[in-house]
Amino acid sequence: MGPVSPQHTSTEPVRLHRWDEIALEKVTEMLSRKIITGEREMLTQIYLKRGCLVPNHSHESEQMTYVLQGALKFLIGGEEITVREGEVLHIPSWVEHQAEALEDTLEMDVFSPIRQDWLDHTDDYFHK
């Protein structure tokens, strides 16, 4: 049996991204981010200062959080989960969660589908 051809071929070109060429968006005094989007997923670099609190929220997107430096404490369903350097946390769609930076932290988030609220700046839960 030969290879199966895809039913959908992307209209997007292949793109190479360089983090140092992507603008840093200051979301709050405690949190900044860089965003790369594809057709159906989003990759972000997030910089959180120690003590930064991302308030409780949920979203349609499935989320993978990979801590590169530092540590984040998540509160999910009444359970505390600490994610440290080199660890990845998977958060399914619509699961309410909040996070606190236990130290200065650099992490990457992958979202699918794309977080449109981040692109159009309607992610006002950061400012509550």
Set out the residue ranges of the language-model regions:
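Ligand-binding loop in jelly-roll beta-barrel domains
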Residues: 93-117
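Short acidic-glycine-tyrosine-enriched beta hairpin
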Residues: 78-93
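A short, N-terminal "cap"/entry segment at the start of jelly-roll beta-barrel domains
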Residues: 1-40, 123-128
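Short histidine-centered beta-strand/loop micro-motifs
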Residues: 34-37, 46-47, 54-59, 100
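Short, conserved beta-strand element in jelly-roll/cupin
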Residues: 47-49, 59-74
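A cytosolic small-molecule/anion-sensing beta-strand core signal
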Residues: 68-69, 84-85, 103
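Structural motif
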Residues: 42, 64, 71-73, 80, ...
